[in-house]
Amino acid sequence: TPEESIDFKARHPTKAREMFFYYYKELAEHMNRWKLVATERPFCVPLDTEDERIFYSGRIDKVIEDESGQIWLLEHKTSTMFSKTLGFRYDFVQSFSPNSQIEGYMYATLFLQHMEELPNDKEFGGVYVDASLIHKAHFHFKRIPIYYNNLLVAEWLDDVRYWHDAFQRSTKENVFPRSPHSCQSKFGQCPYINLCRAKPSLAEIPDEPPE
């Protein structure tokens, strides 16, 4: 409806149908050369072999085998970050390396291969970010390869364990440091921002509400 077009801007069924046509037109050659291994592949993998309570779960959009026999993940992403010269803005393309989601999916894939839940006789190539531009007047698609690197994945695992330990300490000591860089993001502002502005010292906020 016209109202929905206003509310959702370029994100509406008519635009999705047009995008699907152009997506297939531009990328059919790739799809014909690749073999689909899995779609919407769920996973739940441990992060610490000594503590089974710590795990990482998610769902991989697609797993494919390319023409060289390598295993790749396909992660679909949409964006409104339009560039007249490049199609996608440079900062959008660069946002996937380093990227905790991409690196986490690499870690999960290695574990699934180790458990023989994904083909373990194939080399793991990495992740293709299957990007689609959402724009009123333009169509643009790009597959951004992020190549697997074992040192990158090891660093991701160290980071996750560090933040898990930090959160556990905060929970135990009831001390949670501020994270000002999270106050504003592309999704809007934190719903608790007014609380921080009204009472900067959270330690002074009583546990019980006032009578």
Please place each PLM-identified region on the residue numbering:
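Metal-dependent nuclease catalytic regions and adjoining charged, substrate-binding loops involved
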Residues: 86, 94-97, 104-211
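A non-catalytic, helix-rich entry segment at domain boundaries
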Residues: 1-47
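Structured loop/turn residues at beta-strand edges in well-structured enzyme cores
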Residues: 34, 58, 122
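Residues embedded in well-ordered secondary-structure elements
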Residues: 28, 51-52, 179
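Non-catalytic protein-protein interaction segments used by genome-maintenance enzymes to assemble
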Residues: 38-114
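Charge-dense, low-complexity intrinsically disordered segments
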Residues: 3-10, 14, 92, 96, ...
